[in-house]
Swiss-Prot record:
This is Lipid-A-disaccharide synthase. InterPro entries: Glyco_trans_19. GO terms for biological process: lipid A biosynthetic process. It catalyses: a lipid X + a UDP-2-N,3-O-bis[(3R)-3-hydroxyacyl]-alpha-D-glucosamine = a lipid A disaccharide + UDP + H(+). It is an enzyme of class 2 (transferase). Transmembrane segments: none annotated. Gene3D superfamilies: Glycogen Phosphorylase B. Its EC number is 2.4.1.182. It comes from Nitrosococcus oceani (strain ATCC 19707 / BCRC 17464 / JCM 30415 / NCIMB 11848 / C-107). Belongs to the LpxB family. The gene is lpxB.
Length: 387
């Protein structure tokens, strides 16, 4: 007998999307326990009960050149999802971020008459704003996590709902600073610096050697500083091993506990991405670094219309955290900025005050709201579909 329980197709293509989608799934199951999920999933979504059709970690690439080298993987994932939509005809398709892939899939879902909920908007406010109208043709509801995104969709007649930011609920640690430092076997009387090279293999290759060289420079000036490196769920310790050889830093690699690591840190150096907002919500001062293929970077410069690259700075509307981009993200500059931050308590406190203002801007949190929106769409409620 065929299963009549609602079926949701879901896609997340990044580590952060995997995390947000997993929380969404668990919250939906609290409201409607029978709902089934299948799609492109990472480890956290699989743990939440998604039937995985493709491993999202194989899609976690950034930049034009990097994407071109993974086209076979991306094409294979798209074919699997299209086949799933055509064969199973799910009651709802939820797309989490990952716009280049997801908007193409949304177009296919539209032709099949499948409702589409897009959770975490493409950054239309930063570049290619014309996409708002294209999105309106293939998406039934846009659930945004930043309040300033709402007008972009309202003006284009696209149904939009500000659900709050998922990180408001997700970013927390049970430890205070000293407890976290002791938890990881370090001395709470010494400063601790977090090194966060990113969650993608391409980021590790590009950023980890630079971070380690910067840490060695810092260590030569301040040998009492301790180092923590949280390992993303998309990576394994063996992925880092070749880069760590030859370094004698007081460094610990900590898998799957990024927020506890942040709680232990007096400051961090982090790759640009979701982690910069996580740091802001944890109140951890940081230096942001960004390096990618030169061609990808310069093409991005021509298209992107924002003054900052770090999400925490974009939301704040100012450069709260220093950004070191491309050639400026050198071991020398990173070491200098990190040392200045570690040595200047007043500067760290000012940054923390501005981070608190960011936290206030983001609302109460998204988990329950996005889950209720999902269930409402499954139940066929009229949510104001634009004509």
């Amino acid at each position: 007998m065929e299963n009549s329980a609602p079926l949701v197709a879901i896609v997340a293509g990044e580590a952060s999307g995997d995390q947000h989608a997993a929380h969404l799934i668990r919250e939906v199951k609290k409201i409607a326990p029978g709902v089934r999920f299948g799609g492109i999933a990472g480890p956290q979504m699989r743990a939440a009960g998604v039937e995985p059709l493709f491993d999202s970690s194989r899609l976690a690439v950034v930049g034009l050149v990097e994407v071109l080298s993974h086209l076979n993987e991306i094409y294979g994932a798209m074919q699997k999802m299209r086949h799933f939509l055509e064969e199973k005809h799910p009651d709802l398709l939820i797309l989490v971020d990952y716009p280049e892939f997801n908007l193409r899939l949304a177009k296919r879902a539209k032709t099949l008459g499948i409702k589409v909920l897009y959770y975490i908007s493409p950054q239309v406010w930063a570049w290619r704003q014309y996409r708002v109208h294209q999105i309106g043709q293939v998406v039934d509801m846009m659930a945004v996590v930043l309040p300033f995104e709402v007008p972009f969709y309202e003006q284009a007649g696209v149904p939009v709902n500000f659900v709050g930011h998922p990180l408001q609920h997700e970013v927390k640690s049970k430890f205070n600073r000293n407890e976290a430092v002791v938890e990881f076997g370090f001395n709470p009387c010494c400063k601790t610096l977090g090194l966060l090279p990113g969650s993608r293999h391409s980021e590790i290759k590009r950023l980890l050697p630079v971070l380690l060289e910067a840490a060695e420079r810092i260590y030569s000036e301040e040998p009492e500083i301790q180092y923590l490196l949280p390992l993303a769920a998309t990576l394994k310790e063996i992925d880092l091993a070749p880069y760590l050889k030859g370094y004698r830093l007081p460094l610990r690699v900590i898998p799957d506990r990024s927020y506890d690591v942040m709680a232990a840190c007096d400051a961090m150096v982090a790759a640009s991405g979701t982690v910069t907002l996580e740091a802001a919500l944890m109140g951890v001062p940081l230096v942001v670094i960004y390096k990618m293929n030169s061609l990808s970077y310069w093409m991005g410069r021509l298209l992107i219309k924002v003054d900052h690259i770090a999400l925490c700075n974009i939301i704040a509307g100012e450069g709260v955290a220093p950004e070191l981009i491309q050639q400026d993200a050198s071991p020398e500059r990173i070491a200098l900025e990190a040392l200045n931050l570690l040595r200047d308590k007043e500067r760290r406190q000012t940054m923390q005050q501005k981070f608190y203002a960011i936290k206030h801007k983001l609302g109460a949190g998204a988990q329950r709201t996005i889950a209720e929106l999902t269930v409402a769409m499954l139940e066929g409620e009229n949510l104001g579909r634009a004509s």
